[in-house]
């Protein structure tokens, strides 16, 4: 929320001016740091935000067999959500097929060039945009029917967990039976 954004700005200014960062909203310094903790911890060791990704996926697809394992990380940017996503499908789908399916999906912009800067970032591409940006589309080396994707969006316009599910939904609807 706005209190967290204000704390990030304040801590950034304090640290750049050689002062110690004061923590009020976060349990530890957020400026120039990464926190593997969003929302409260549950008994199973996951946070509520991580379990919401699981619950929402099962709910949207209506399939209790879908498995999601997420680690949600707070990264100190003022706006934007970013996700590294691994998808395992029941049938093989090539990265080119996935790229074309996603390119045809409403609200998805593909930015996937294999060069420095050929991928989307939350701050530069997604801020102020309604579209979800997808890049770094590639075969997952650990799964024979797996894909890895990099996804960014403006969290003030679209929620991150929902968009991950929407992308997976597009792949399933258009390719996987």
Mark where each language-model region is.
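Active-site-lining helix/loop region of Rossmann-like oxidoreductase modules
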Residues: 1-101
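C-terminal active-site/capping subdomain that shapes the small-molecule cofactor and substrate pocket
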Residues: 65-177
